[in-house]
Amino acid sequence: MNRMFRLAAVLATLAVPLPALADPIAATLYKNPQCSCCEGYAAYLRENGFTVDVKPSNDLAQISADAGVPADMEGCHTMFVDGYVVDGHVPVGVIRKLLAERPQIAGITLPGMPMGSPGMGGEKAKPFTIYAVTKDGAAPKVYAVE
């Protein structure tokens, strides 16, 4: 009987999705009020264990600039998570890498609105290049390719 109980406990644990086992990661996402892909990105984050507070704003360029994201590297929206800026449709795996490594940067960005990225429609045409940004004006450097 004890063996059956242990087996049932193990199987029940495996049935729980992994994001549900971890504490949710709180994020604040600033987006253009008319943008629907940003809502898709927020839903993607929620499905992957984030709690997302979506804030419509008509001042995204300034929010990104204040966070250290150069104008030519801006993504579709700007998010803040655990002291970092995450600009654009950055995949969750790269955000988790950022939070685990805790590098001395302002954050990361996936410039533009690449097709096939989380929250965007279409198929992924090529790997996404995510850049690290700083507030000191240094040129962005490749942080991850996914």
Region roles according to the model:
Residues 15-19:
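N-terminal signal peptide c-region/cleavage motif recognized by signal peptidases
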Residues 1-8:
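Bacterial N-terminal signal peptides that target proteins for export
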Residues 51:
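Residue-level detector of anion-binding/catalytic polar loops
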Residues 22-48:
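Local sequence-structure signature of Cys/Sec-based thiol-disulfide redox active-site neighborhoods
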Residues 66, 72-146:
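Thiol/selenol-based redox catalytic cores and closely related redox-interacting motifs
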Residues 8-10, 20:
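Cleavable N-terminal signal peptides
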